[in-house]
Amino acid sequence: MSNYNAVTAKNTENAPNGNGLYSQTVAFSHYNNLSAQLPIEPQTGKLVAGGIKEQAEQCFKNIKAIVDSIDHVMSDIVRITVFVKDIKDVDAVDEVYKTFFPTYVPSRTTVAVAALPMDALVQIEALVSHGEGTIPNAPQAGDLIKLTNNTANAPTSPLSTQTVSFSHYNNLSAQLPIDPKTGRLVTGGVQEQAGQCLKNIKAILESIDVPFDDIVKINIFLKDLSDTEAVNEVYSTFFPDSAIARAVAYVPARTVVAAAALPMDALVQIEAVVSHGDGTPPQAIEDRHGIVIWANNTENAPKNSLSTQTVAFSHYNHLSAQLPLDPKTGEMVAGGVKEQAEQCLKNIKAIVESIDHVMDDVVKVNIFVKNIEDMDAVDEAYKTFFPGGVPARRTVGVSALPQDALIQIDAIVSNAEGTPPKA
């Protein structure tokens, strides 16, 4: 087994610790998954003094400390996700952002949410390339390059790259419903806006010669969760895209999140994670024939016609967000937030086990909670599933969740065996 990648968690004293609940960064294969960073001073464990600017700076300092501690640099970051409490604070965050990314800019998602841990104003997360891989005692050359791409056929921004490819994944900036010709929001309501977001994603993928059905995970941020049905109507006209994908009814994994606000006062914003069989140099393009998408659903977790429970490509599995639904009844589990958190994690465990994996293979967990004060109760349940506190983690408070749930959880899982074509 020694020639397989291993889940590698790391922590440094120069950034806030996860109190045994999560690691600062978990590397697997060619990516480091960082826990979302709060504006906490590592020395004191308290929020930094000052306003939004000081808080944003502290988040980036913490990210930099983690990145430095694993012998990487800030330009190895392929995606940044910025969560703010107040969308008007984004300009101040951007001022700080520029000082940490003076030339190269990663792909980026910006969203305002209802609440953040410790009453912070901002929380920032980074995904970092890891060319050396994680095969124990056998580091790779680390010579993979990342490819950045922008097309005039989708909205451009000086603060983000439309897509950053590294190894077998493309990471797209979240797309707003902006008409690239005018630079303004498209006219119409949420359906027109959702259509424009998806058109922009399609334009970016076409510009790098990647089919739309190579998307493995979609994250939809909605200003009003009650718009979900309207967005689904548009969504189902885009997926599946090709005849071959329709033949197997392939749809990506998916998470829907209620945003307190979105940039430009948009009603919807859509983020895509995309498989990249061509790889990045010096990986050989023709090797793509040896890597395919594995999509999987199990009866032991709730099913949804618009999303696959887990989609694997190469060394990662991407899980759809799990609600606290009992898969047998399709109903919300009885009890409070602790029971709900437990059910979400049971569903994740059922999905993970259905693809012959174990919870130790989980590298990153994203928690969306209705009431941020509930996190102590959530953590009680969480610890029983992740006693070692290994996976990296992100927690955000949201104003609403599907089916009036109190919590929703999704996960990224390592996939050491890869995804060769099945005989």
Regions found by a protein language model. Give the residues of each.
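N-terminal presequence-like segments and the immediate start of the first folded domain
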Residues: 1-61, 65-78, 84-199, 203-216, ...
